[in-house]
């Protein structure tokens, strides 16, 4: 019965909810906006939402509407359409240190040992929690605008490479990369 469609090609709402339940969403920011019209001001709301499966897929979306719940719904739908996959080391942290920027906002992300936790501020924390990262140290420099911070974080995560993709690009074995990582700089210079 699961996955059946009713007349008209619509899925049953229960099945749709089961499919959507794999995602965790976090509301990052709500902004009240005003449009000046002839009769006065018309108020609306803008929402920024981050959504992820806590297994390496994450996306963010922006939605605007006259009511808060509608703006959040639109932002969530937008985030689902913009999911990206990020490779994680041991399913808990980043493979290497990275930096990202958007506008005047810069973020620096560092891989951390097990047990460190998420050391990051506001919007970046929401991205890491929905992504499934458990150990990371992050620093934001410059603009503290939530939109810029989220976009800068996604810019940094876009440049995240797994050892497998690096080894394929450089035509070397993954074990060679791993030995250089564990051994440190002294052994890498000796080779």
Swiss-Prot record:
User: Which HAMAP family does the record match to this protein?
Assistant: Ribosomal_uS5_B
Signal sequence interval, chain numbering: none
Q: Name one GO molecular function term.
A: structural constituent of ribosome
Pfam families noted in UniProt:
Ribosomal_S5, Ribosomal_S5_C
The residue ranges of the S5 DRBM domain are 23-86
One GO cellular component term, please give it: small ribosomal subunit
Q: What does this protein do?
A: With S4 and S12 plays an important role in translational accuracy. Located at the back of the 30S subunit body where it stabilizes the conformation of the head with respect to the body.
Its domain description in UniProt is: The N-terminal domain interacts with the head of the 30S subunit; the C-terminal domain interacts with the body and contacts protein S4. The interaction surface between S4 and S5 is involved in control of translational fidelity.
What family name appears in the similarity comment? Belongs to the universal ribosomal protein uS5 family.
Keyword field: Ribonucleoprotein, Ribosomal protein, RNA-binding, rRNA-binding
Q: Where is this region: Disordered?
A: 1-20
Entry-linked Gene3D superfamilies: 3.30.160.20, 3.30.230.10
Gene name, per UniProt, is rpsE
Matching entries from SUPFAM superfamilies are given as: dsRNA-binding domain-like, Ribosomal protein S5 domain 2-like
Q: GO annotations under biological process?
A: translation
Q: What is this protein called in UniProt?
A: Small ribosomal subunit protein uS5
Quaternary state and partners of this protein? Part of the 30S ribosomal subunit. Contacts proteins S4 and S8.
């Amino acid at each position: 019965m699961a996955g059946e469609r009713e007349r008209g090609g619509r899925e049953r709402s229960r099945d749709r909810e089961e499919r959507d339940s794999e995602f965790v969403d976090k509301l990052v920011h709500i902004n009240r906006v005003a449009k000046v019209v002839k009769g006065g001001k018309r108020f609306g709301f803008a929402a920024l939402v981050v959504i992820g499966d806590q297994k390496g897929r994450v996306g963010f979306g922006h939605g605007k509407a006259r009511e808060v719940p509608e703006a959040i719904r639109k932002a969530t739908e937008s985030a689902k359409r913009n999911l990206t996959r990020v490779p994680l080391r041991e399913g808990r942290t980043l493979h290497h240190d990275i930096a990202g920027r958007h506008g005047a906002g810069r973020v620096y992300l560092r891989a951390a040992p097990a047990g460190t936790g998420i050391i990051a501020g506001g919007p970046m924390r929401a991205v890491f929690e929905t992504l499934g990262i458990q150990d990371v140290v992050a620093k934001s420099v410059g603009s503290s605008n939530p939109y810029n911070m989220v976009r800068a974080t996604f810019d940094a995560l876009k440049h995240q490479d797994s050892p497998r993709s690096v080894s394929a690009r450089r035509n070397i074995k993954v074990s060679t990369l791993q030995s250089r990582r564990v051994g440190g700089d002294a052994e890498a210079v000796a080779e």
